[in-house]
Amino acid sequence: MSGAERRPAAGRVQLDSKPTPTTTADGNQNITEVDAFDKRQTFDPAVQYKMNHQRRGVALIFNHEHFFWHLRLPDRRGTLADRNNLKRSLTDLGFEVRIFDDLKAEDVLKKVFEASRDDYSNADCFVCVFLSHGENDHVYAYDAQIKIETITNMFRGDKCQSLVGKPKIFIIQACRGDKHDDPVLVQDSVDSKDETTVNQTEVDAAGVYTLPAGADFIMCYSVAQGYFSHRETVNGSWYIQDLCEALGKHGSSLEFTELLTVVNRKVSHRKVDICRDINAIGKKQIPCFASMLTKKLYFHPKSK
């Protein structure tokens, strides 16, 4: 058979014809096999999302501080600091920020649906933030729970075609469990001011679980599943504080998942210093994110 006849046809899957056995010291055979591969499928690991559209995109912030009495949920003191910090950080990155405070569940879903019907053809991406209490696979609006999947489903490719292939970022600041993370490292405590401005630490009730959302989604959670998310009554939540600081310092230069890893590290170095629940003193927190992104994501400054 000639050399030309032995060559595989272009585009065909190529396999090693036979695994190669080797014999180990104890007499057993160690066989190495090669997985099939398609020569056409070559991926550039450095490929980035196209972020040079006319607009950066829309960022929705649903901020919930107060809740209907029958839910028996405490007010989320300090959440206004989170809302304002996020507005500043996202605006600096070029987003059109829309803020909604203490909306009922029906109104939240209406605003989300309206956003999903917008035309994002000339936008880079989309951001949606929830600052609230959470439970299982839900977050709380003013008067009722909302299933997170109900929200993310509105931005899938068959529902929001102008965001197909573009990053869809969801940030959830809510508790995800009923446990505190025990500290393993000692950290210097934060000095408190006079009693009227003491910055106490509180937790966001109940738990939120990670959900699949589809390609080009990234779900950013303030805490790993099963643990409390901490919020300071003056400065806001640990996660949003450190996220906004990282966005301010590195938002236009660092790849987004790398930036989130920096935030994980910063939050993990914190611990509870002042809290009405004495069992929470000294406890820690670790955020997490679930990335379904398919390319690297940068928020490089837009040319003017």
From Swiss-Prot:
Summary of activators and inhibitors of this protein: During activation, the N-terminal prodomain is removed by cleavage. Concomitantly, double cleavage gives rise to a large 18-kDa and a small 11-kDa subunit. The two large and two small subunits then assemble to form the active CASP6 complex. Intramolecular cleavage at Asp-191 is a prerequisite for CASP6 self-activation.
Catalytically driven reaction(s): Strict requirement for Asp at position P1 and has a preferred cleavage sequence of Val-Glu-His-Asp-|-
Residue numbers spanned by region Disordered: 1-29
Ranges where the record places region 130's region: 137-154
List of catalytic residues: H133, C175
Keyword flag Protease: yes
Family under the similarity heading: Belongs to the peptidase C14A family.
UniProt xrefs under PANTHER family: CASPASE (PTHR10454), CASPASE-6 (PTHR10454:SF206)
Protein name per its UniProtKB record: Caspase-6
Source organism of the structure: Gallus gallus
The gene coding this protein: CASP6
